[in-house]
């Protein structure tokens, strides 16, 4: 996260960290004891998922690591378009217990409204050159825009996507924050999919997969319908 501050240790009990190698990682959101939600483009064959992590250098006493038991991507996703249906549900190999630093974030009950102030968070780059990564996650506030702002900036916007950022630039998600949550008015509304390169450019908000539009799919998969298709 560019232009943010260190997150409070108690602010992100639902934020999980997926690592595949030291240089490749993503954010994830715990939505119940056994499932996390992230971006489809974060999918890797062998991944480790750490819940209750804060500082990379010092483990929280309740930090846990899980592997993925099964990963679910929309069967109707266009494989060669990163931003199409960029959402993935992962079932953990064993459930996690709620603790001081572990608690799921519930799915949204309403869609977000344009103009909302939204919170972003992650262990991603804190410099636009993407050469500095923090030991603890950084948090910042950004704004939810009308989708036309992104359509004008990038000549288009995928369906079921939110457009969020800061028009003057300087505050944004960045490399390594992918898959992490966009939280608007306390509700889990978006999953970081894609943004400008370099990050935090003026008038170039980022794309967040709109969680609300995928609720039927998410609920079907969790209920055991493994072949549910996305809207």
Curated annotation (Swiss-Prot):
Query: What controls its activity?
Result: Inhibited by PMSF and benzamidine. Its clotting effect is strongly inhibited by antibothropic serum. Is not inhibited by heparin.
Keyword Disulfide bond in annotation: yes
pH dependence per the UniProt record: Optimum pH is 7.0-8.5.
Q: Which GO terms describe its molecular function?
A: serine-type endopeptidase activity; toxin activity
Please report the PTM annotation for this entry.
Answer: Glycosylated.
Q: Which reaction does it catalyse?
A: Selective cleavage of Arg-|-Xaa bond in fibrinogen, to form fibrin, and release fibrinopeptide A. The specificity of further degradation of fibrinogen varies with species origin of the enzyme
Residue numbers annotated as active site: 41 (charge relay system), 86 (charge relay system), 178 (charge relay system)
Q: How does it assemble?
A: Monomer.
Name this protein carries in UniProt: Thrombin-like enzyme leucurobin
Q: Which organism's genome codes for this protein?
A: Bothrops leucurus
């Amino acid at each position: 996260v560019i232009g943010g501050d260190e997150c409070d240790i108690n602010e992100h009990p639902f934020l999980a960290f997926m690592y595949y190698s030291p240089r490749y990682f993503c954010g994830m959101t715990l939505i119940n004891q056994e499932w996390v939600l992230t971006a489809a483009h974060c999918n890797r064959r062998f991944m480790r998922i750490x819940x209750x992590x804060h500082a990379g250098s010092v483990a929280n006493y309740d930090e846990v690591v899980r592997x993925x038991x099964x990963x679910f991507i929309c069967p109707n996703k266009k494989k060669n378009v990163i931003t199409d249906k960029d959402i993935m549900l992962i079932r953990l190999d064993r459930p996690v217990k709620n603790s001081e630093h572990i608690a799921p974030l519930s799915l949204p009950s309403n869609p977000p409204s344009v103009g909302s102030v939204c919170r972003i968070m992650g262990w991603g780059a804190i410099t636009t050159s993407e050469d500095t990564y923090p030991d603890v996650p950084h948090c910042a506030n950004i704004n939810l825009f009308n989708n036309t702002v992104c359509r004008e900036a990038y000549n288009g916007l995928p369906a079921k996507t939110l457009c969020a950022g800061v028009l003057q630039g300087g505050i944004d998600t960045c490399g390594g924050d992918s898959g992490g949550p966009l939280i608007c008015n306390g509700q889990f509304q978006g999953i970081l999919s894609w943004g400008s390169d370099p990050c935090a450019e003026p008038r170039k908000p980022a794309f967040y997969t709109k969680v609300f539009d995928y609720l039927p799919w998410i609920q079907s998969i969790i209920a055991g319908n493994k072949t549910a298709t996305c809207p």
